[in-house]
């Protein structure tokens, strides 16, 4: 909470604080969650690489980075001889997929990176709980978030998923 941005000082301080809170010696997978326009990417890449070199982190991951910035991170890591990310975490699901499949998936395949999506169930919408465009009317903590997907196109996807499930006795 006290750490903002991805400067070298912030990255190391946040990792050390996480290790202390966890009571652990090493973090298995450490994410850069958002690109930081105020810090040169080379500084961020070097900082994450140093965490791996120093044994505080086993692997690096990036989340919410554009394909161009992921490619730039990889190039910088190779140039510096530091650890490359092994995971990309995009917002990806059946409702939000075209830009990911067009650009990020080919990059991940080419560079042998894993994809670990967030909002895989479209904030709960793809569970099938919401069957109309008034999803926000549900009195649940997640209903408002799921409501953005409760469109005619979204409901068509739910209907298709239900038909597939029914065909398989699910």
Language-model segments: what does each one mean?
Residues 16, 25-28, 49, 58:
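Core alpha-helical elements of the protein kinase catalytic domain
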Residues 1-12, 33-39:
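Active-site mouth loops of central-metabolism enzymes
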Residues 5-22, 43-46, 70-75:
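Short, acidic/polar
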């Amino acid at each position: 909470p006290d750490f903002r941005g991805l400067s070298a000082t912030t990255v190391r301080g946040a990792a050390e604080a996480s290790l202390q809170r966890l009571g652990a010696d090493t973090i298995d997978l450490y994410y850069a969650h958002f690109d930081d326009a105020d810090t040169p990417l080379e500084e961020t890449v070097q900082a994450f690489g140093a965490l791996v070199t120093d044994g505080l982190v086993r692997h690096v991951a990036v989340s919410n980075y554009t394909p161009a910035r992921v490619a730039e991170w990889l190039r910088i890591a190779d140039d510096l001889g530091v650890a490359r990310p092994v995971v990309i975490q995009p917002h990806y699901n059946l409702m939000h997929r075209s830009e990911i499949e067009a650009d990020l998936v080919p990059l991940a395949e080419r560079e042998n990176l894993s994809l670990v999506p967030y909002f895989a169930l479209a904030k709960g919408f793809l569970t099938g709980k919401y069957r109309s465009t008034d999803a926000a009317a549900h009195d649940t903590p997640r209903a408002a978030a799921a409501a953005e997907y409760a469109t005619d196109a979204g409901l068509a996807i739910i209907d298709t998923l239900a038909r597939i499930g029914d065909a398989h006795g699910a």
